[in-house]
């Protein structure tokens, strides 16, 4: 909930897998704070979209490929809890040099990343992109936004017709 709320309060756009659990709670937080929420859904149906999604996008793809589209469309990734799907998204973000921020204390995969990370902050010895670890939602969102502002994502990969559009996280 708090991650979505903080993202909205910063004027950024929340993008999730659009269904239940952490995705729904963060979407609710964003909506209640006046934010905009995009849900990237596996398959062709809107049936699984949670009630807080403003823009549901059916990808026509199975879950794992839907996650790749979501990660590729994001400027940064905040990892909360998670299991095997989150592991795939983490790997995809790392391979695509997306800023990765882990919300410590959120359980699941998030509680294990630092232990298996190379030098405590990389997936492997290639050191594609450093993983940041934050203790609370506000710090995680601020870190994500700051990492985006430092030009981690190559400028030519961003296409915005309207400069007033919110930042994507």
Feature map (PLM): residue ranges:
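Glycine-rich beta-alpha loop segments
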Residues: 1-38
